[in-house]
Amino acid sequence: MPIIIDKDLPARKVLQEENIFTMTKERAEKQDIRALKIAILNLMPKKQETEAQLLRLLGNTPLQLDMHLLHMESHISRNVAQDHLTSFYKTFRDIEKERFDGLIITGAPIETLPFEDVDYWEELKKIMDYSKTNVTSTLHICWGAQAGLYYHYGIPKYPLAEKMFGVFEHEVLEQHVKLLQGFDELFFAPHSRHTEVHAADIEKVEDLKLLAISEEAGVYLVIGQNGKHIFVLGHSEYSCDTLKREYERDIQRGLNIAVPKNYFKYNNPDEKPLVRWRSHGNLLFSNWLNYYVYQETPYIL
């Protein structure tokens, strides 16, 4: 089934070239189908890139999704044209009286800042508070997951001695949780971050369950309140070349950055990346939508 997006959204062309079924809002309005209403709070600087990454995964399920893009009103985005935000995005004030089946809160490259020093922290707190009663399930990604764990459960983040950067092996800890249906016992996922959360802090909270962890990269997947909150501490949505472009960007800036681990063939940045997380990423998003959104949400929001 398709994802319903604006016919002029640039990501639509990218998805169509990959044979991912999209539908315009005009066509969807003629159908007698209750599509799942999903919002993406896009905190990433390169918004169009993140749109394509997430919509690619969301569009690979049997469910019809009505997509809504959100940005922070209290933050000036410098890496995206204002007319793109005006044309395709809403703010929290625009939607605060609505309800959603699902919400995705993305990462943001600001993890070294204390949460309270982030210029849109107060607005983000309002959105996370809103999600408690107006969203069936919220999926938090990377910094968004750290922010959610901190706001909802008081879990702190800790600085790393060096950037966690690469593709790492993870172990499934809970075999019979719906979010992990179909997962191999060991799977790979990308990470790109300067901070981490500790498993010991999560294990102290009764409402949280640690689902997957990496010996090298640490906590990866946490579930709260039986699926009301999902926290993904990595980037299963990343495209095949995302880490490559991050690495090349940092090299050009003169930063002391290591080659992303377990990513390039022969660990040689002149070789092409090895994609080992695509099937897991698709399964993670599909399971979230099926078990924690579609099967839990009321027909009438």
From Swiss-Prot:
InterPro entries: Class_I_gatase-like (IPR029062), HST_MetA (IPR005697), MetA_family (IPR033752). Its EC number is 2.3.1.31. Keywords: Acyltransferase, Amino-acid biosynthesis, Cytoplasm, Methionine biosynthesis, Transferase. Its main location: cytoplasm. One of its GO terms (biological process) is L-methionine biosynthetic process from homoserine via O-succinyl-L-homoserine and cystathionine. Pathway: Amino-acid biosynthesis; L-methionine biosynthesis via de novo pathway; O-acetyl-L-homoserine from L-homoserine: step 1/1. It is an enzyme of class 2 (transferase). One of its GO terms (molecular function) is homoserine O-succinyltransferase activity. It catalyses: L-homoserine + acetyl-CoA = O-acetyl-L-homoserine + CoA. The record marks 192 as: Important for substrate specificity. It is found in: Cytoplasm. Pfam families: HTS. The active site is at 142 (acyl-thioester intermediate), 235 (proton acceptor), 237. Substrate binds at residues 163, 192, 249. The record marks 111 as: Important for acyl-CoA specificity. One of its GO terms (cellular component) is cytoplasm. Belongs to the MetA family. PANTHER family: HOMOSERINE O-SUCCINYLTRANSFERASE (PTHR20919:SF0). Transfers an acetyl group from acetyl-CoA to L-homoserine, forming acetyl-L-homoserine. This is Homoserine O-acetyltransferase. The lineage of its organism: Bacteria, Bacillati, Bacillota, Bacilli, Bacillales.
